[in-house]
């Protein structure tokens, strides 16, 4: 049995920025962070240099330290401003990257607080691990990683593991592959262990039992390989779901 990671209210509250979990997760990336980090580096160097030479009474070096500090302060402020500007557009970013409406983005964000929502992909001990996490709510799937990618569960046709995902360099990698209800809506979570893949797939399956979770399967006497037959598998899912809705 795959254990789902259900957080309590206090734990979920810690995964929010300005009252939003998706904004909190979106803030994991951005050019502003790089600028601010560079600014802090200059500040540390400048302060260390100033402290070192001020006791030695070297006016020229003291000025050099001060000159290093000022650009550092400016970079920190500029980085914070750029990051705030980026984070402000989180709703639009999720909508555009996911191909869903902004109303869906806001609904998914609200469902994070639902008691049935399972958090997936909290791996590693770095401070941004939770920001890179995903979650499966009653109606939505936020894909783990730094990209603002959301699926409506009703739009997920397949979510399966493979150890034969072909990378850009021609090698193979372990991955969770996610198909939407059209061939263009596909996502891969690459370099994921089988155990971690099972965590993600198990959460999706629990919330949406109709999703295909096996790479290879048989239906009506025909064998399918979801990795090699993406369009056929998506078409099969749409046909079966269409028949069940009638």
Regions found by a protein language model. Give the residues of each.
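Short, exposed beta-strand/loop patches in secreted or surface proteins that constitute
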Residues: 128-137, 149-151, 178-180
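Short beta-strand segments that buttress and anchor functional surface loops
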Residues: 26, 142-144
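Anionic N-terminal interaction surfaces
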Residues: 2-5, 80-136
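Phosphoinositide-dependent membrane-docking surfaces
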Residues: 141, 150-166
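Short amphipathic beta-strand/extended segments with alternating polar/hydrophobic composition
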Residues: 92, 150-154, 186-192
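Acidic, Ser/Thr- and proline-rich intrinsically disordered linker/docking segments
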Residues: 160-246
């Amino acid at each position: 049995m795959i254990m789902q990671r259900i957080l309590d209210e206090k734990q979920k509250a810690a995964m929010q920025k300005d009252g939003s979990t998706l904004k909190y997760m979106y803030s994991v990336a951005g050019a502003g962070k790089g600028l601010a980090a560079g600014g802090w580096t200059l500040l540390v160097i400048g302060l260390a240099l100033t402290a070192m030479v001020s006791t030695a009474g070297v006016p020229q070096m003291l000025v050099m330290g001060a000159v290093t500090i000022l650009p550092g302060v400016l970079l920190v402020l500029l980085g914070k401003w750029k990051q705030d500007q980026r984070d402000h557009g989180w709703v639009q970013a999720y909508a555009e990257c996911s191909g869903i409406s902004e109303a869906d983005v806001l609904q998914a964000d609200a469902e994070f607080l639902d008691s049935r929502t399972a958090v997936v992909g909290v791996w590693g001990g770095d401070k941004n691990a939770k920001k890179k996490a995903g979650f499966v709510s009653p109606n939505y799937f936020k894909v783990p990683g730094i990209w603002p990618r959301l699926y409506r569960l009703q739009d997920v046709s397949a979510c399966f593991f493979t150890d034969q995902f072909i990378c850009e360099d021609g090698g193979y990698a372990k991955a969770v592959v996610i198909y939407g209800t059209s061939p263009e809506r596909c996502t891969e979570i690459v370099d994921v262990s089988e155990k971690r893949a099972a965590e993600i797939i198990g959460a999706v399956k629990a919330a949406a039992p109709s999703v295909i979770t096996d790479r290879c399967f048989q239906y009506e006497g025909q064998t399918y390989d979801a990795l090699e037959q993406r369009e056929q598998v998506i078409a099969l899912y749409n046909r079966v779901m269409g028949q069940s809705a009638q």
